[in-house]
Structures are given as C-alpha cells and as structure tokens.
UniProtKB/Swiss-Prot annotation:
Transmembrane intervals: 19-39
Gene Ontology cellular component list: peptidoglycan-based cell wall; plasma membrane
Protein name: Biosynthetic peptidoglycan transglycosylase
Class in the EC hierarchy, top level: transferase
Pfam families hit by this protein: Transgly (PF00912)
Amino acid sequence: MSKSRLTVFSFVRRFLLRLMVVLAVFWGGGIALFSVAPVPFSAVMVERQVSAWLHGNFRYVAHSDWVSMDQISPWMGLAVIAAEDQKFPEHWGFDVASIEKALAHNERNENRIRGASTISQQTAKNLFLWDGRSWVRKGLEAGLTLGIETVWSKKRILTVYLNIAEFGDGVFGVEAAAQRYFHKPASKLTRSEAALLAAVLPNPLRFKVSSPSGYVRSRQAWILRQMYQLGGEPFMQQHQLD
C-alpha cells in the first residue's frame, strides 16, 4: 500500500473515531437531558420538516405540544402498549420472542417484512435517528435503547413516546393528535379514540385517523379487545405507568 493511501486511510479512521465520540457525547447528553426535560422536537420531526422544504412544501409544519403523563388519558398509554408492545413493563428494551417470530416470518415472506420493535426501540429511533432500514441504524438503535432503558423509568419512556409518535401528516404527539382529530385535549380521550390513534401507528402516513379504512377499524377493534384482556386501567396502575 502506498504512503498516500495509508495517509488517506489514517485520516478517514481518525475522522470516523472522532465522529463516533461526538455522536456518543451528543446522544448521551440527550438521554440525560430528556430524562427530566420536555422534548422540543425529535429527529423524525426534523427529517419530515426538511424533506417538505426540499420538495417545495413550505406550508408543512411538524407540530407537537408536550404534555406530561398526568395530562394524557390512561386509555392512550394502554392502547399503544396493547397495540405495539404488550411486554413493555417487563423487558429491558427488546422482546426476544417477537424478534425471533419476525425473523422467521421475514424469511418466509421476503416481500412482507414484519417488524418487532418495542416501544423503547421506537422511542430511541424517533428521538435520535433517521428513518429507514439499515444494519448501521439498527445497531445505533440498539445502543440508544439500552441507554434510555438504563437511565429512564418505564413511565418516562412511555411519556416521551406518546409525545413524539407520528399520528399523521405533520401531527406529532398525542396532544396534537387529540386536538386535530377529536378537538379535545389528550386527557379527555376515550378508550375508543385512544384505540383508533394507536391503530394507525404502524404507518400513520398511509393509515388515516380522519378517514379510517376497514383495516384500521378492524385493528382498532382488536386493540380494544387487547386492552380489555390486559386488564384495563388497573394495568397502568399496577405497573406505575399512569
């Protein structure tokens, strides 16, 4: 290998190492800060806003209103747990059984990829990372998930998740969603309304709260049944999530 190529390789290696250190400090600081402070915006919100501007859509506004857990209907927290991650109170960020099932399904159905991300993983991804699928992003997501599971309580993870989740075009967080779709604060959401909001979370840009498809309605009904089977509001109290 020539001296010039060695020099370039050495420069790139030093640059990447420094970048990793900077990102680690940035993300570590974010995890520490947002363990107590409201989250003003997420990486997904920034990505959506910048993408809209780049496409000439200057009317798009990524909107979110932070609210504490006691300003959110307990039905909403229960609905997303029932829909997205029923083992949320028990695991340390990863549902191994669900991951194994998803991998087996994806091997059989390459055109219909199934995910197995927990609420903790989705929170880490939405807050700190870019959208998309890659092993690099998945690796970073795993590290960030362990970080927030170590520093934050389960109640804090759920609070942040509900405040940054995307519920529609430009609609981020349960307070903005409740105001947009039901003209009421998040604290007043009913069990059925909470289940409908949770029903669009797999793909909120495809599935619409304002005009729910038959699939969304059937998923809403399934979520309502799961909420009942989990035990209703006492489930949230039992796990200190309310």
